[in-house]
Structures are given as structure tokens and as C-alpha cells.
Regions:
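Leucine-rich solenoid repeat scaffolds
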Residues: 77-103
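Intrinsically disordered, low-complexity regulatory segments in ankyrin-centric signaling systems
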Residues: 1-39
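Conserved ankyrin/ankyrin-like repeat signature
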Residues: 32, 64-65, 95-96
Length: 103
């Protein structure tokens, strides 16, 4: 799994336990994110480090996933270490930056 370096990702794979929604969002798997949400997964759930699905999608450049999460109530102002907007800015994902700023 490729994630940008801004993520609070452990060095050891044994420590990497992402919640279902965060995992699928980080990979840009729109259909899996839709399934998770349909199955009642909390759109604002986070991993142990406080990293949300919206942050994962924004950081990794998945605009379609970002939009789906926002449409389903993701908190765009939530800040773990960084907000989703800050992560998108650091990763230079212009379309996501513009979308999040338009909200």
C-alpha cells in the first residue's frame, strides 16, 4: 500500500492496523468505501493515530472518495495532526484542495 509520507504510518507492517474505511479510502477503492458506509461504518472513524478516511483519501489524491465521504457526513474540519485540506495541500492535490475549500 502506497501512502504519502505525511501519514502517521508505522514502520513495521505488524503495527499497521487501519480500520476498514480508512484502509479502503487510502487506496481509493470507491466501491469498497461505498460498501463500508452502506454496512454502517462510521464515516468519521479513525485509526489509533487519529487518521480518518477523509484525511486518507485527500492525502492520496482520491477526489471521488473525498466527495463520497463528505456527502455521507465526514467532518471536513476534523484535525488529527493535520486536516484533510492541509494533507491535500502538502501533497499538491489541486482538485481536492479546491473542492474542500468550496465547502
Amino acid at each position: 500500500m502506497k501512502l504519502n509520507s505525511f501519514s502517521p504510518i508505522p514502520e513495521n507492517d505488524d503495527e499497521l492496523h487501519l480500520p476498514e474505511l480508512v484502509y479502503w479510502a487510502s487506496l481509493g477503492e470507491l466501491a469498497e468505501v461505498e460498501k463500508s458506509l452502506a454496512n454502517g461504518v462510521d464515516v468519521n472513524s479513525t485509526d489509533d493515530e487519529g487518521y480518518s478516511a477523509l484525511q486518507a483519501a485527500a492525502e492520496n489524491g482520491y477526489l471521488d472518495v473525498v466527495k463520497l465521504l463528505v456527502e455521507n457526513g465526514a467532518n471536513v474540519h476534523y484535525k488529527g495532526e493535520y486536516t484533510a485540506l492541509q494533507l491535500a495541500e502538502m501533497a499538491e492535490h489541486v482538485e481536492i484542495i479546491e473542492y474542500l475549500k468550496s465547502l
